[in-house]
């Protein structure tokens, strides 16, 4: 469960609730189409679940 996840922001933060913006900023996704690679931990999986409609996840 320690493999990396490739996460890309595909929907703008404009109009999103403050909590969702905070989650995206916590993952380092601050611009549209930005991609980050994060470890597959329960914390990151929970963050992805909060903003699943705004991101694309690849293994």
Swiss-Prot record:
Keywords: Ribonucleoprotein, Ribosomal protein
GO cellular component, one term: cytosolic large ribosomal subunit
One of the record's GO molecular function terms: structural constituent of ribosome
Stored InterPro entries: Ribo_uL30_ferredoxin-like_sf, Ribosomal_uL30_bac-type, Ribosomal_uL30_ferredoxin-like
SUPFAM superfamilies on file: Ribosomal protein L30p/L7e
Pfam families: Ribosomal_L30 (PF00327)
Single GO BP term: translation
HAMAP family: Ribosomal_uL30_B
Complexes and interactors: Part of the 50S ribosomal subunit.
Family to which this protein belongs: Belongs to the universal ribosomal protein uL30 family.
Family matches, as PANTHER family: LARGE RIBOSOMAL SUBUNIT PROTEIN UL30M, MITOCHONDRIAL RIBOSOMAL PROTEIN L30
Protein name stated in the entry: Large ribosomal subunit protein uL30
Organism whose genome encodes this protein: Geobacter metallireducens (strain ATCC 53774 / DSM 7210 / GS-15)
Gene: rpmD
């Amino acid at each position: 469960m320690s493999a990396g996840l490739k996460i890309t922001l595909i929907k703008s933060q404009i109009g999103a609730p403050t909590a969702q913006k905070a989650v995206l900023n916590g993952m380092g996704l601050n611009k549209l189409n930005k991609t980050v690679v994060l470890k597959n931990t329960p914390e990151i999986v929970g963050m992805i679940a909060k903003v699943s409609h705004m991101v694309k996840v690849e293994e």
